Amino acid sequence: MAAHRKHVFVEKVLQRLFPPVPSGQGKREPQTLAVQNPPKKVTSEKVSQKHAEPLTDTGSETPTARRLYTASGPPEGYVPCWPEPSSCGSPENASSGDDTEDQDPHDQPKRRRIRKHKSKKKFKNPNNVLIEQAELEKQQSLLQEKSQRQHTDGTTISKNKKRKLKKKQQIKRKKAAGLAAKAAGVSFMYQPEDSSNEGEGVGEACEEDGVDTSEEDPTLAGEEDVKDTREEDGADASEEDLTRARQEEGADASEEDPTPAGEEDVKDAREEDGVDTIEEDLTRAGEEDGKDTREEDGADASEEDPTWAGEEEGADSGEEDGADASEEDDTITNEKAHSILNFLKSTQEMYFYDGVSRDAASAALADAAEELLDRLASHSMLPSDVSILYHMKTLLLLQDTERLKHALEMFPEHCTMPPDHARVISAFFSYWITHILPEKSSD
């Protein structure tokens, strides 16, 4: 019983170590290669065991020194289920291995190519599929339209006719949609009919204007002619009156002296009367000339008056400009005074906060500073003093201490303000020079 159990156990162990190869899987390469190597080891083990068996006793087991596995080797009469790997079987396996090696380089690229082709077919973008379907539908619709045209027309249409038909259809579609057609070239060309009509209209308008002016001109011309004739008639009438007066005077003289003895007296009288008439004519002419000269002088005076008026207007405008300039100067001085007032207020706060002057003179200085600020606020300070203070402030902002010191030295001589106010200003500016500016430069 123990021997039978041992035999069964050995068979099961060997079956697990060397499972039998099924008939269908003999063609696969990796399993055949995996099975080929262990039999070789087994054969070598069996050969070693066969050589070692005669040295031991017949009933004893294999020696433990040469055991290569945990399980004991197969007994002498054990026959496995699969065909024993013999020496004659090894060349077949070797030949089959050679065949597989020969077939591998030819078979593998084909399989790879097939797999690549399959992968391309399997993985497709859905967008491409939709595009292909749309293209197929378009092609089918075009084929249907072509077939319908061939059935309807019966005769083939040339390309030129097709192009013209397409243009007509496009024009019809545009008109139906309400789209404006392109501007024709004729609209930009010269149009003789319209221009002739316009020319006729302009000519008619000119003729009408000419008629109107001709109708209006006679009245004006008539008035001017009447004026000229009146002036000429007045001159002629004055000359005729003079001649008639002369003749009447001569007749009176002849009637008064009919005696021959008085002919000489008549001659003398005529001569005297002629002299008198000449003198009268001269006086009249002088009076008329005086009137004319007076009228001319009046006209000249009227012409010269604009110059006087222009001079008067220039004087007025000069006065206005002077007033404007004075107003501008006042505004500038007020702005300067306002900026100086703010500057002095801030300086006063810093000066008395630091406690630079703790003597009894500090109270008087504070009172003088208040008076100075009141004058600046009320704009009662002279513009010259304001300009000097503004100049000193600009020098302080520029940090030009040398020029500022020189200006402070010259300030009491050139300013017109009281000495107390001048002391306040010199104290404030010197405070800036000695205390504030050095701190800023050190920072």
From Swiss-Prot:
Renumbered residue ranges of the record's region Disordered: 15-333
Domain of life per record: Eukaryota
Chain intervals with Acidic residues compositional bias: 205-226, 250-266, 297-332
Keywords recorded for this protein, A-Z: Acetylation, Phosphoprotein
InterPro entries, A to Z: ERICH1 (IPR026719)
Biased composition, class Polar residues, residue ranges: 87-97
Residue stretches of biased makeup (Basic residues): 109-124, 159-176
Keyword check for NADP: no
Residue positions where Phosphothreonine is found in the record: T277
Positions with biased composition (Basic and acidic residues): 42-54, 281-296
N6-acetyllysine modifications at: K12
Residues recorded with modification Phosphoserine: S238, S254
Keyword Phosphoprotein: yes
PANTHER family assigned to the protein according to its UniProt record, in alphabetical order: GLUTAMATE-RICH PROTEIN 1
Protein name: Glutamate-rich protein 1
Gene assigned in the entry: ERICH1
